Amino acid sequence: MAKDIKFSEEARRSMLRGVDTLANAVKVTLGPKGRNVVLEKKFGSPLITNDGVTIAKEIELEDAFENMGAKLVAEVASKTNDVAGDGTTTATVLAQAMIREGLKNVTAGANPMGLRKGIEKAVVAAVEELKTISKPIEGKSSIAQVAAISAADEEVGQLIAEAMERVGNDGVITLEESKGFTTELDVVEGMQFDRGYASPYMITDSDKMEAVLDNPYILITDKKISNIQEILPVLEQVVQQGKPLLIIAEDVEGEALATLVVNKLRGTFNVVAVKAPGFGDRRKAMLEDIAILTGGEVITEELGRDLKSATVESLGRAGKVVVTKENTTVVEGVGSTEQIEARIGQIRAQLEETTSEFDREKLQERLAKLAGGVAVIKVGAATETELKERKLRIEDALNSTRAAVEEGIVAGGGTSLMNVYTKVASIVAEGDEATGINIVLRALEEPVRQIAINAGLEGSVVVERLKGEKVGVGFNAATGEWVNMLETGIVDPAKVTRSALQNAASVAAMFLTTEAVVADKPEPNAPAMPDMGGMGMGGMGGMM
């Protein structure tokens, strides 16, 4: 396919048009008075959102060179979202400002490599200063503030803070769509996995259709149980203890299942059988997790154990087990704290090494189940369109909160970027490097300016006043007042601000050092199909 090539100024100008188109669509959403953007969907109702990365991913421009510029800035939003989970609009605004300022200087004759060095120096200094001024997040109220600012909804802030308090900072918090209008929190304490009872005859509560076992023994194996003789020795020991039994096995079938059900119905003993969760290596790991949590052993041939040799000592114990048609929940396992901590450490190490997003998610789930539980935020709304928009906002708030727990918080509303202004301005440099530093200084003002513009105010006036204020004092665009941002609870996670700045600078530096752009030439329209008027179907009647 033939290629279209543009050089130097012409190439950069074409790409800049794409950058501006995308950034202008995204930046209207910034701040407490930011607006929404409506995205057309091929199927279903349009999506209304103020999430920067969602908007950026949807934008596709007709001109190939403009589209490349737009895609570069979309990459800033996407990367920031991957690292910090929020701050994508801020990252886009910063990138646009750096690219625009940088191009002015390149056009005026500045050396792009010198500018790049200056930009990199300035960002390193800004990130160091952000670390210095960030404060660790303390208590439920701080978490609620971070989440409420991100979602622009205090109720969501409270929900997320409560969820994190209940399941711990490492706990898994998932989002589900609710059938109702309200958004509510549902916390599953203990370890839950998605396998239900092998037979409905095993239930103990016919109203709720669930089996509840108090202080049960737990037999954990990766084998199929089809012959009752295999588990008879251990069954007899459990019956003598007068306790119920939960069997977790690859499968319980045939004669073994029939015998267990008959004895359960006769009242000889209380037993529930469930299939082991997961598949393959993940199943082995999850069975091991359950064993450590309940203080039992996995009875597996890999360790030279068979079911006939199992004793009460090799079984796990728990305070309570609830088994429904679809889920099994083990609460208050009696495993030793040291072993559980060691297992958590092991999973954390695997989390750091894995590159697969799917594996990361599964490891995070296992970690949460061992560390305390799973919280589910059920998102409700009046219409499907509102539901999708609300879900995106809560997802951002959740990511923001996790980022705040990791690296602390800084003053929100773009104030923290202005607070590092003096530090960046004090860097000693000459020539094009100094110009590169000035490009970053100009970009640091941009988020505050845009927040003010979206609130219907003159951005430059707010920026100039902010330069003279003490660290931490900023402009609350929601009320139009000047306040101490940290004390008022208008905060951003340091990680989000840092990621936005670093990613914007990275793409801007690459953009400015571009000298040629290559794109596919658009193909001429394909000729239309020839007229088929002479091919009437009348003569084919005899084929019917």
From Swiss-Prot:
This is Chaperonin GroEL. ATP binds at T29, L30, G31, P32, D86, G87, T88, T89, T90, G413, N476, A477, A478, D492. Forms a cylinder of 14 subunits composed of two heptameric rings stacked back-to-back. Interacts with the co-chaperonin GroES. It catalyses: ATP + H2O + a folded polypeptide = ADP + phosphate + an unfolded polypeptide. GO terms for molecular function: ATP binding; ATP-dependent protein folding chaperone; isomerase activity; unfolded protein binding. Pfam families: Cpn60_TCP1 (PF00118). Belongs to the chaperonin (HSP60) family. One of its GO terms (cellular component) is cytoplasm. The lineage of its organism: Bacteria, Bacillati, Bacillota, Bacilli, Bacillales. Together with its co-chaperonin GroES, plays an essential role in assisting protein folding. The GroEL-GroES system forms a nano-cage that allows encapsulation of the non-native substrate proteins and provides a physical environment optimized to promote and accelerate protein folding. It is found in: Cytoplasm. It is an enzyme of class 5 (isomerase). Its EC number is 5.6.1.7. HAMAP family: CH60. Keywords: ATP-binding, Chaperone, Cytoplasm, Isomerase, Nucleotide-binding. GO terms for biological process: protein refolding. CDD domains: GroEL. It comes from Bacillus thuringiensis (strain Al Hakam).
